[in-house]
Amino acid sequence: MSRGPFAFFRLPRLLPAVAAVLLAGCTGVPGGVEPVEGFDAGRYEGRWYEIMRLDHRFERGLTNVEAHYTLRDDGTVGVVNRGFDPEACSWKQVEGRARFRDDPDTASLRVTFFWPFYGGYHVFALDQDDYRWAVVSGPTRSYLWILAREPELPEATREALVEKARELDFPVDELILVDHGPPVCESGNGR
């Protein structure tokens, strides 16, 4: 069967459509995970400390990890993530932008640090009284963060949040506790 002399022209038009579908799939919510309703981005704004996480290459080895969220006039959320790399003896920082997937009252966003690649950011547990802690999922159960307004979270609260994630089939046995002590270089010199 002949594809005709112009068949190769179809591929360039198909690639953007395929890329759009693949990139959109990176922002979805894992099945069974329900983002918080009644979300107030103004109260969520500010500094959050990473208490526990499922480790990934982009954070591997980092201590003292924080996220800073800032509401922008255009309706997006500015994101600054930073952490200390003991091996390099330096702070690492990345800036990005997040947009609500749908209704801003639902804690489900898509975030980018490297356009055009977006990832899901879904707050599925939140201290809605005081916004003191949050549990966040990425687009799959391979991404999980427990965040708090202070560098430490009471053990009973932390255990309850881990149990909530366990009930939703996150691999909580792989969670690591993030060190928020004074930054120490592997050579032994703190900065």
Please provide the spans of the model-predicted regions.
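A beta-rich soluble binding module of mature secreted/lumenal proteins
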Residues: 2-6, 26-191
